[in-house]
From Swiss-Prot:
NCBIfam families: rpmF_bact. One of its GO terms (cellular component) is large ribosomal subunit. It comes from Acinetobacter baylyi (strain ATCC 33305 / BD413 / ADP1). Residues 25-34 have a biased composition (Polar residues). Residues 1-44 are annotated as: Disordered. GO terms for biological process: translation. Residues 7-16 have a biased composition (Basic residues). PANTHER family: 50S RIBOSOMAL PROTEIN L32, LARGE RIBOSOMAL SUBUNIT PROTEIN BL32. This is Large ribosomal subunit protein bL32. InterPro entries: Ribosomal_bL32, Ribosomal_bL32_bact, Ribosomal_zn-bd. SUPFAM superfamilies: Zn-binding ribosomal proteins. Pfam families: Ribosomal_L32p. Coiled coil: none annotated. The gene is rpmF.
Amino acid sequence: MAVQQNRKSRSRRDMRRSHDALTENALTVDQTTGETHRRHHVTKDGIYRGRQLFAKAADAE
């Protein structure tokens, strides 16, 4: 079992944890379709930076 060499203070512990906070996804609105999507990601329609990268797949139902 691991045993600490020296006790860490609350300050040191909290400084280590300062990078553990979660951030919200950055969202943006597509200028052509008005759809909200994550930045630097392709929309559901297959559009990225104003270009159609692939056709939307038809539903399999």
